[in-house]
Amino acid sequence: MTDLNKHIKQAQTQRKQLLEESRELHREKLLVQAENRFFLEYLTNKTEEYTEQPEKVWNSYLQKSGEIERRRQESASRYAEQISVLKTALLQKENIQSSLKRKLQAMRDIAILKEKQEKEIQTLQEETKKVQAETASKTREVQAQLLQEKRLLEKQLSEPDRRLLGKRKRRELNMKAQALKLAAKRFIFEYSCGINRENQQFKKELLQLIEQAQKLTATQSHLENRKQQLQQEQWYLESLIQARQRLQGSHNQCLNRQDVPKTTPSLPQGTKSRINPK
């Protein structure tokens, strides 16, 4: 009986120890389960985060690629439009330059005509001086001849034997002298009028030629200035086109150097299926 009680007590003591150990194990189990849940949640969150990260990177890549492509297309469109405008302006300037070349050719013809007119002006001036000199010489000759004839008639009328001449003879001589004077005056008058008319005509032609020469000179100067202006405008347009081409080349290089992969990055299988279920 005593042994039985002893065994019962031992069994109760062992049972109590086992219960205590069982409770301790249960507490440790709960603690481990709590820690496991925490790590499981942490791992789950990290797994979802890492799983979503490639998709975010891919979406960011697509967005940046689309933005870069849009900017590239806008730049290309602006560049093409500017080039078109510049080409149109350059074509207009080439047409103007072609027209200017034709005008310059006409200007050369005008210069030749101007040189010819200047020679004609010089010839007319020389002829005018020559005619004036000849007129003065002939006038002096006629005056000398008339003066000589007048003196001869006066001598004949004043000779001592004039009493021997009849009244009729004297009247004839007087009439002849008067007629000679009138003829001389008429000749001188008509000759002077003719010379004056020729001089007036020469002056008129000379003024016309001088006026034409002045107009030709003004036209030539205007065409030369216009030619220089068009050459400067053409040089400016060509420089502007070259500058825009260099600027576009630099812009394209900047776009190519941006942090965008040249090839489409491959996504994880799970991300691809999430983006495109097909």
Swiss-Prot record:
Keyword rRNA processing: no
Residue ranges, annotated region (Disordered): 253-278
Coiled-coil residue spans: 1-30, 105-243
UniProt keywords, alphabetically: Coiled coil
UniProt cross-references to InterPro entries, sorted A to Z: DUF4515 (IPR032777)
Record bears the keyword Coiled coil: yes
Record-linked Pfam families: DUF4515
Annotated transmembrane regions: none
Protein name: Coiled-coil domain-containing protein 121
Organism of provenance: Homo sapiens (Human)
